């Protein structure tokens, strides 16, 4: 049986704004130069929910940038700063910087510019920050040749209707998600974070080009009791219209993370076909 492992050579150069550009080229087969064509794009975003740089790099060492994007959240970014994020980008990974900005328009706009300068692939902000904040963010990165995807956070997947009621929103989570997603789209954002249950109605409301990033993805939802309530399997989420699937523990705690990624990508290819 032929060896199907890929070797990657990392090419680095600066763009006209001085940012580092990266490209992976498969050196075993020059015809395969970019896994993430529109037909081959992997939907998986692996949440690197580690507490330190050592554990993160130890895990990422075994991953293939062709099989997934990666996400750094508040805990890891606070612990390691931008050095780890830039290291992962330089290794060829598309990085989702999940810091959920929520501040005055100028502050969020400047933060998005810094993320763009780093070469971040995706960055998010709370859509509840309002139109002026989101428009400022979109304007801040508009001049970049390869700008990060700007994603609005709608309703956290840990929240249920009772949680919304406690903060004064007497509305179903699905209605609030659609309301905030429409606001995000009209404010110039590229997509939103939403649970898979909201993906189908959002597709109907906002069209096929709007990016839907879905956390709460589990390989098997039976017996799930973690802190994300509105969950689905990869196949269910993709069928519902999700663009990207955020997976943390199902990948990071798997005995064979690469096998999990290959299986999810196999399911994704079947859904696409």
Over which residues does each language-model region extend?
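N-terminal amphipathic alpha-helix/helix-capping segment at the start of soluble metabolic enzymes
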Residues: 28-51, 55-58, 200, 204-205
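Conserved anion-binding
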Residues: 41, 103, 107-111, 118-190, ...
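Hydrophobic faces of well-ordered beta-strands that scaffold small-molecule active sites
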Residues: 44-48, 70-72, 95-99, 123-125, ...
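C-terminal helical cap(s) of enzyme catalytic domains, especially alpha/beta-barrels
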Residues: 134-138, 251-273
